[in-house]
């Protein structure tokens, strides 16, 4: 019985002495793990979170943020505006989040913006 032909490993092309390594840009990753942990400790001081669960929460927050930002951007473009205002963010929240969750988040955001602008 004949053995299957073995493939030779591919060799990388050799570099000239004057040629430099090409560095790839690392994709920027925004992490909110610290803030998730701070909120967890405010709400439930006696509960911890595993690193795997923290990674999932971080991905979830980044995903929601990305979706809200792109939806708000789309709304600004539809209205021929070059600036995303709180109104676009609020509308994006209403479009992306379901019913009661959207109402709750809009009221919380309004409260936070009011607190921020009053300087308290």
Curated annotation (Swiss-Prot):
Gene Ontology CC entries for this record: nucleosome; nucleus
Subcellular location: Nucleus; Chromosome
List of residues that carry N6-acetyllysine: 7, 10-11
Record PTM: Can be acetylated to form H2BK6ac, H2BK33ac and H2BK34ac. Monoubiquitinated to form H2BK143ub1; may give a specific tag for epigenetic transcriptional activation.
Domain of life of the organism encoding this protein: Eukaryota
Residue(s) of cross-link: Glycyl lysine isopeptide (Lys-Gly) (interchain with G-Cter in ubiquitin): 115
Alphabetic keyword roster: Acetylation, Chromosome, DNA condensation, DNA-binding, Isopeptide bond, Nucleosome core, Nucleus, Ubl conjugation
Stated family: Belongs to the histone H2B family.
Name of the molecule in the record: Histone H2B
Annotated organism of origin: Pisum sativum (Garden pea)
Gene name, Swiss-Prot/TrEMBL: HIS2B
């Amino acid at each position: 019985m004949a053995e299957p032909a073995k493939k030779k490993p591919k060799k990388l092309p050799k570099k000239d002495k004057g040629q430099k390594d090409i560095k790839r840009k690392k994709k920027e990753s925004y992490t909110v793990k610290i803030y998730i942990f701070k909120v967890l400790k405010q709400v439930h001081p006696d509960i911890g979170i595993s690193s795997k669960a923290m990674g999932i929460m971080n991905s979830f927050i980044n995903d929601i943020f990305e979706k809200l930002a792109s939806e708000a951007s789309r709304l600004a473009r539809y209205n021929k505006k070059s600036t995303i205002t709180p109104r676009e963010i609020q509308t994006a929240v209403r479009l992306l989040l379901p019913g009661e969750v959207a109402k709750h988040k809009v009221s919380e955001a309004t409260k936070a913006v009011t607190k921020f602008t009053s300087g308290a």
